Structure formats: C-alpha cells, structure tokens
Amino acid sequence: MARENTNKHYWLRKLKKGTASVAVALSVLGAGLVVNTNEVSAAVTRGTINDPQRAKEALDKYELENHDLKTKNEGLKTENEGLKTENEGLKTENEGLKTEKKEHEAENDKLKQQRDTLSTQKETLEREVQNTQYNNETLKIKNGDLTKELNKTRQELANKQQESKENEKALNELLEKTVKDKIAKEQENKETIGTLKKILDETVKDKIAKEQENKETIGTLKKILDETVKDKLAKEQKSKQNIGALKQELAKKDEANKISDASRKGLRRDLDASREAKKQLEAEHQKLEEQNKISEASRKGLRRDLDASREAKKQLEAEQQKLEEQNKISEASRKGLRRDLDASREAKKQVEKALEEANSKLAALEKLNKELEESKKLTEKEKAELQAKLEAEAKALKEQLAKQAEELAKLRAGKASDSQTPDTKPGNKAVPGKGQAPQAGTKPNQNKAPMKETKRQLPSTGETANPFFTAAALTVMATAGVAAVVKRKEEN
C-alpha cells in the first residue's frame, strides 16, 4: 500500500509539472508532436490575425475540447481512483480468498487424511469383520462338532451309565451271591471245623483215656509182675515145683504184655493218626482261612471295582457337567461373537456414514474450491475487462490526439497560405475569446508584440497561459497518466 501511494504521488507530481508531462508525452507519442507545440501555438496565434472568425471558432473548439478533456481527465482520475480502490478491495478480497483457499485446502487435506484414515479403518474393520465372520464360521463348525461330540459323548455316557448300572447290578448281585456263598461256606467250614474239633477233642480224650487206662493196666501189670516176681523170688524156692506153671503164666503175661505193647502201639498210631487228622484239619482250616482271605480279597476287589465304577460314574457325570459347561461357554462365546459381529457391523455402518459425511464435506470443499477458482477467474476477467476498458479509453484519447494533430497540421497549412496575404495593423490587439475583429490598415511590421501577448493568454479567460498546458499538452498528459495507470496495473 505504501509503495502504491508513493507511486501515485509520484505520478501526480509528474502530471503537475509541464516538463515531465511533455517528457511522458514524448515517450508515449513521439517527440515530433510535442516539439512543435510552441510552433503550433504560434501558428494559431498568427492565424487569428489573418482570420479572426476562424481563430475564434478554433479557439472555442479547442476550449470546448480542452474542457471536455479536463472533464474526461477528472472523470478518468475519479474512475482511476475508484478502480484503484476497487482493485485494492479486489486484492484484499483476493488475498482473503487465497487465505480462505489455503484454509480450505488445509481443511481439504485434513479431510483427505481423515478420509484415508477412515478408509484404512474401514478396510481394517472389513478385514476384522471378515476375520470375525471366518472365526464365527469356524466356531460354528467347531460348535457343531462339539455338539455332535457332546451328543455322542452323552450317548456314550448314557450307554456307559446303563452299562455301569447293569455292571453294578451284576456286580452287586455277584458280590451278594459271593458273599452269601462265602458266608455259607465259612459257616459250613466253621461248623465242620467245630465238628472236627469236637471229634478231635473226643478222639484225643478217648486216646488219652485209653492211654491212661493202658498205663494203669501196665502199672497194675507191673505191680502184679513185681509182686509175682517177688512172690516168685520169694516162692522160688517154694515154687520151683510151679516153675512150669509160672513159666506158662509168665508166657501168658509176656503175651499179655505184647498185647499191651501192641495196644499201646495201636494207641500211638491212633494218637498219631488223630494228630495227623488234627494237622489236616488245621491245614484245611488254614486253607479255609486262606479261601476266606481270598474271598475277602475278592470281595474287597469287587468293592474296589464297585467304587471304581462309582468313581467312573462320578467322573462321567463330571465330564458330562464339564461338557455342559463347555457347551454353555461355547454358547456364551457364540453369543459374544454374535454381539461382536453386530457391534462390528454397527461400527462399519458408522464408519460408512462418517465416510459418506467426509465425502460430502469433501465434495462441498471441492465445490467451494471450484467456486473460488471461478471467482478468481471472474476477478481476473473483471481485471482484464478493466484493463481493456482503460486501453480502449487510451486508444480513444490517442485517436483524439491524432485528430488534433491533423487539425494542427491543417492550421499550419492555413498559416502557410495566410502568410502570402497582407498583414493587419499592429496597433489593434486581438484578444481571444471576446470576439473583437482586427482593425483595417495595420502594418505588417507591427504584429510581433500581439503575438507575444497572445502566447501568454488563454483563449477563453485571458489568463496567462503556460505553453505546456495547451490542449495538446493536457491531452498528452491525460494519455500519459492513463498509460502509466495501465502499466502499473499490468505490473501489479
């Protein structure tokens, strides 16, 4: 702004100075027209002496043209100032539009980044949805397999439970039967053992009684034998006659002793047999006890089998409960996956909605960018129209200058033709703008002073005139000013 104000004041100073305006006119139109300005002015002044009416008309015409040019110049200045102000406004608006465009471009880039991010998130969510669907299908397949396996396990468990019940029932029946048999056999063995013990005790008692009797008999026999021996010894002398009888009796006694020995041996054999029978009974009793232990061990094994079957039943029930819990967990997982799938679908819908909003915002921004571009093109178009208008006005001014140059050339030609006629009297001064006719009888040598005076007066007001501010000079200055404005606009 400071530079433009400086340039404006600079050109105003140049327009105020006649020499500078003539220099500008020389640079624009050429040196020929401006160099001859004084000569034209002088020619016009000399022409007025020869033909005052034509000079008056020419001066009036130049005054009107000068007035029109001044008016046009003022209008052009005003319009130039307005155009400058409008140009400044357009520049400010253009800067604002550029700033707004940059902001919109930044927002557009941000929205593009958001769109790319949303697209990436959308692709990620689509992949997650696909993975979730794949996992859901896999879980459905696994759930179907687990359901089939669960049904199969339930069927097997039911079969095992039925089989376990049947086995348990059979084992219970077998155990009860075995226990009853063992108890019956044990009772029978106990009764047999009791009977055998009674028989053994009775046999032992009988054997002991018989042995005691045999001992008593042997003692008695020994006593008898001793008494007999004593008697025999005492009566040996006395009973020598009865030796044969005694020998016979001794033989009988020996035979009785042998019989007693045989009886004693038989008793020993019976005792040994009873002891053997007792050992056999004890062995049989031990065998029965071992069988009882075996039956007890079998009963314990059956009890263990029963406990194992019950434990297996409990394990099967626990497995069934575990499978039911796994089924519940899988059902809950399936429901969770369904919820996750619904949530992912909802998120996908939201992402698509956000993407649509972003696309709509992006479209609005693109539309706004297009409008900005169009407005920019429109301002450039208005600027071009303004420049074309200024160039057209400058061209019109140049055409007017050309016309004035032609008229000046005609005036010069008229001056050349008038120089052949007699001069007017020098005593009568021609005052331009008042319509005074020159007096007759003037001498040719008296026309230098009026020429100097008319050079210093304006045609209409009679004021002292600057030769540089003639109509041609003003036209040249106006044209130069317009050309300078156009040039500055082009540079801007």
Swiss-Prot record:
<keyword id="KW-0134">Cell wall</keyword>
<feature type="region of interest" description="Disordered">
    <location>
        <begin position="408"/>
        <end position="464"/>
    </location>
</feature>
<comment type="similarity">
    <text>Belongs to the M protein family.</text>
</comment>
<feature type="repeat" description="1">
    <location>
        <begin position="69"/>
        <end position="75"/>
    </location>
</feature>
<keyword id="KW-0572">Peptidoglycan-anchor</keyword>
<dbReference type="Pfam" id="PF00746">
    <property type="entry name" value="Gram_pos_anchor"/>
</dbReference>
<dbReference type="GO" id="GO:0005576">
    <property type="term" value="C:extracellular region"/>
</dbReference>
<feature type="signal peptide">
    <location>
        <begin position="1"/>
        <end position="42"/>
    </location>
</feature>
<feature type="modified residue" description="Pentaglycyl murein peptidoglycan amidated threonine">
    <location>
        <position position="461"/>
    </location>
</feature>
<feature type="propeptide" description="Removed by sortase">
    <location>
        <begin position="462"/>
        <end position="492"/>
    </location>
</feature>
<dbReference type="InterPro" id="IPR019950">
    <property type="entry name" value="M_anchor"/>
</dbReference>
<dbReference type="GO" id="GO:0006909">
    <property type="term" value="P:phagocytosis"/>
</dbReference>
<dbReference type="Pfam" id="PF02370">
    <property type="entry name" value="M"/>
</dbReference>
<feature type="compositionally biased region" description="Basic and acidic residues">
    <location>
        <begin position="249"/>
        <end position="354"/>
    </location>
</feature>
<feature type="repeat" description="2">
    <location>
        <begin position="76"/>
        <end position="82"/>
    </location>
</feature>
<feature type="region of interest" description="5 X 7 AA tandem repeats of L-K-T-K-N-E-G">
    <location>
        <begin position="69"/>
        <end position="103"/>
    </location>
</feature>
<feature type="repeat" description="D 1">
    <location>
        <begin position="388"/>
        <end position="393"/>
    </location>
</feature>
<dbReference type="InterPro" id="IPR049895">
    <property type="entry name" value="SMDRR"/>
</dbReference>
<feature type="region of interest" description="Disordered">
    <location>
        <begin position="71"/>
        <end position="131"/>
    </location>
</feature>
<feature type="repeat" description="C 2">
    <location>
        <begin position="286"/>
        <end position="320"/>
    </location>
</feature>
<keyword id="KW-0581">Phagocytosis</keyword>
<feature type="repeat" description="C 1">
    <location>
        <begin position="251"/>
        <end position="285"/>
    </location>
</feature>
<dbReference type="InterPro" id="IPR003345">
    <property type="entry name" value="M_repeat"/>
</dbReference>
<keyword id="KW-0175">Coiled coil</keyword>
<protein>
    <recommendedName>
        <fullName>M protein, serotype 5</fullName>
    </recommendedName>
</protein>
<feature type="repeat" description="3">
    <location>
        <begin position="83"/>
        <end position="89"/>
    </location>
</feature>
<dbReference type="InterPro" id="IPR049896">
    <property type="entry name" value="SMCR"/>
</dbReference>
<feature type="repeat" description="4">
    <location>
        <begin position="90"/>
        <end position="96"/>
    </location>
</feature>
<dbReference type="InterPro" id="IPR005877">
    <property type="entry name" value="YSIRK_signal_dom"/>
</dbReference>
<keyword id="KW-0843">Virulence</keyword>
<keyword id="KW-0732">Signal</keyword>
<feature type="repeat" description="D 2">
    <location>
        <begin position="394"/>
        <end position="399"/>
    </location>
</feature>
<feature type="repeat" description="5">
    <location>
        <begin position="97"/>
        <end position="103"/>
    </location>
</feature>
<comment type="function">
    <text>This protein is one of the different antigenic serotypes of protein M. Protein M is closely associated with virulence of the bacterium and can render the organism resistant to phagocytosis.</text>
</comment>
<keyword id="KW-0677">Repeat</keyword>
<feature type="compositionally biased region" description="Basic and acidic residues">
    <location>
        <begin position="71"/>
        <end position="115"/>
    </location>
</feature>
<feature type="region of interest" description="Disordered">
    <location>
        <begin position="235"/>
        <end position="354"/>
    </location>
</feature>
<feature type="repeat" description="D 3">
    <location>
        <begin position="402"/>
        <end position="407"/>
    </location>
</feature>
<keyword id="KW-0964">Secreted</keyword>
<feature type="short sequence motif" description="LPXTG sorting signal">
    <location>
        <begin position="458"/>
        <end position="462"/>
    </location>
</feature>
<feature type="repeat" description="D 4">
    <location>
        <begin position="409"/>
        <end position="414"/>
    </location>
</feature>
<feature type="repeat" description="C 3">
    <location>
        <begin position="321"/>
        <end position="355"/>
    </location>
</feature>
